[in-house]
Regions:
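Short, conserved beta-strand/loop elements in beta-sheet-dominated catalytic cores
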Residues: 98-120
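Residue-level signal for the nucleotide or nucleotide-sugar donor/cofactor binding architecture
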Residues: 91, 103-106, 197
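Glycine-rich flexible loop motifs, especially short His-Gly-Gly/GGXG/HXGH segments used as catalytic or interaction
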Residues: 3-28, 56-57, 82, 87, ...
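A hydrophobic, helix-centered structural microdomain
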Residues: 12-77, 192-215
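Short, glycine-rich, amphipathic interfacial segments at transmembrane boundaries or analogous
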Residues: 55-92, 153-183
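Short, well-ordered beta-strand elements within core beta-sheets of diverse protein domains
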Residues: 96-103, 190-194
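Positions in alpha-helical segments
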Residues: 27, 42, 55, 94-98, ...
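Hydrophobic structural segments characteristic of membrane proteins
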Residues: 112-215
Length: 215
């Protein structure tokens, strides 16, 4: 069922309840299926470098609420470093971390964010706080009216995004992300919010089967 307006009516609330139930089922099944591979990933991280297995970066959730998410640690970094699209300034990406980023495995622990209700399986991509600050006010209100997701309409353009940003560093990388990648993600996020529903979620999930689910 489509959700239509941003303010939930009784039918929309029923859709949201159904969506939450589907989120729990999918996240639970994937968590069970990935538990052994995840343990191997955790062991590889510990053997590769010192530090915790998981990192807790901040992301902006529904209605602008700040949430701390779970991801596999992929770098040795200053905990006070500023996070950007290219990573934290001064960070040193580990050998295992580089592979986890390339394969999209670093985001597997986000399944726990689905189970605890901060994320949905399908929803606009969660963004770093510094970039939410440049959202146009109208788009910000729309995109942040729903929970962020693991995958969305922009997931199918991930390869094109990586190609666009490949080889860029520092200010050039930041500029390309803010001026080219972010506006497209926001437009797709707006499309999702305005047309969201069971069938759209199903189409997005089906499209993600062509590549790694959590990339």
């Amino acid at each position: 069922c489509a959700t239509g307006p941003l303010r939930p009516s009784i039918p929309i609330q029923r859709c949201l309840i159904m969506k939450r139930a589907v989120d729990i089922v999918i996240a639970t099944l994937l968590s069970v299926l990935l538990i052994l591979p995840a343990l191997l990933v955790a062991l590889a991280i510990k053997l590769d470098s010192r530090g915790p297995v998981l990192s807790r970066p901040h992301r902006v959730g529904r209605h602008g609420r700040m949430v701390k998410v779970w991801e596999f640690r992929t770098a040795i970094a200053d905990p006070d470093a500023m996070e950007t699209v290219g990573g934290c300034h001064g960070e040193q990406v580990t050998r295992v971390g580089a592979l986890l980023r390339k394969l999209g495995i670093a985001r597997w622990p986000l399944l726990w964010c689905v189970l605890n209700g901060d994320f949905s399986v399908v929803g606009p991509r969660a963004e770093m706080p510094r970039y939410v600050g440049v959202y146009p006010p109208a788009l910000r209100k729309v995109v942040l009216s729903v929970k962020p997701g693991l995958v969305d309409l922009s997931s199918r353009e991930a390869h094109a995004e990586r190609a666009l940003l490949a080889g860029l560093e520092g200010d050039a990388l930041e500029e390309a992300y803010v001026e080219k990648v972010l506006p497209r993600r926001l437009e797709l996020g707006k499309q999702y919010v305005e047309g969201r529903g069971f069938w759209m979620d199903l189409r997005i999930l089906a499209g993600c089967l062509a590549g790694p689910l959590l990339r």
